[in-house]
Amino acid sequence: MLRLVTYYTDTHEEMARKYVMSRAWGFDERVCVRVEQSCPTGEFKSDGWNDCMIDKLRTLRNLPADNVPTLYVDADVCLFPTLVEWCRWRVEHMEPEEVAFSDDVLQWCAGIMLFRSSKRVHQFWDTLADLSRAWNLPDQEALHLLRMQTQAQKGTLPIRAQVLPRDVFCNWATIHQQPPAPWTGESFEIPKTCLAWHANWTVGITNKFKMLERVMLGETSNAAACTA
C-alpha cells in the first residue's frame, strides 16, 4: 500500500492535475485536496503564503493515522513513471517515525516528503503548524529553524529525519552550480536517475509551467507506455 498526497489552490489546480495526478502511476491511493486561496496570487512568500503552507500541514494532519506509507508532493512536482517502485523500496528501509525530505541544497525541502502516516508524524505536523504561526514563518523555514535550534541545544527532533537522494528527487538547485540561484530560462538536462522533478528555485507560476513543460519534453522515461 502506497499513498500519494498533494493539495492545491485555484492558481495551482492545472499544475496539480497535469504534473501530479495524471502521472500518479501505480499508487494505491491518491489524495488531491483543494483548499481556499488564502494567498491571492499564489506566488512564493506573497501575502497569505504562510497561511497556504499551514493548509498543507492541515492536509497532512487530516490523513488517517494508519501508518500507511505516504508520499507528499507539492503541486509543482512532475512525477516520473517508476517513482512508485522506488518509493516502495525506500519505505521498506525506513524507521517507523521517519520523515524523508527532499534536498533543497541550502536546507531540507518540505515540497516532497516520504513518511508513514502515524500518530507521531501527525504530532510533528501540528508542531510545525504551531511554530509557523508563532514565528510567522512558512513551514519549511519553521522546519529549518527548529532543526538549527535542536542541533544547538544537542536535542532531537520528534521524528527521525532523513534526506532523499538528489539524483532521484531533482530540482534546479540540485543540478545547477553552487551557490543556487533562481532559474531564469537556462537549458538543463534531467538526470537519467530522476523520478520526480520539483519546480522550486523558480520564480512565478508562469515560469514553473515553462520549467515543467521542459521536464516533460526532456523526460528520459517512456511515460506514454505507462497506464494509470
Predicted regions, residues:
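N-terminal anchoring/stem segment of glycosyltransferases
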Residues: 1-68, 119, 217-228
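A structural signal for short, well-ordered beta-strand segments and their strand-loop junctions
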Residues: 31-34, 71-74, 100-101, 156, ...
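Short, solvent-exposed loop/turn segments at secondary-structure junctions
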Residues: 9-12, 38-40, 77-78, 105-107, ...
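GT-A fold catalytic core of metal-dependent nucleotide-sugar glycosyltransferases
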Residues: 52-122
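Catalytic core and acceptor-binding pocket of nucleotide-sugar-dependent glycosyltransferases
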Residues: 121-228
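A residue-level signal for conserved active-site and pocket-lining positions in enzyme catalytic cores
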Residues: 4, 23, 60, 76, ...
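Short beta-strand/turn micro-motifs composed of small residues
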Residues: 5-8, 101, 198-199
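Short, glycine/charged-enriched secondary-structure capping and boundary segments
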Residues: 19-20, 85-88, 212
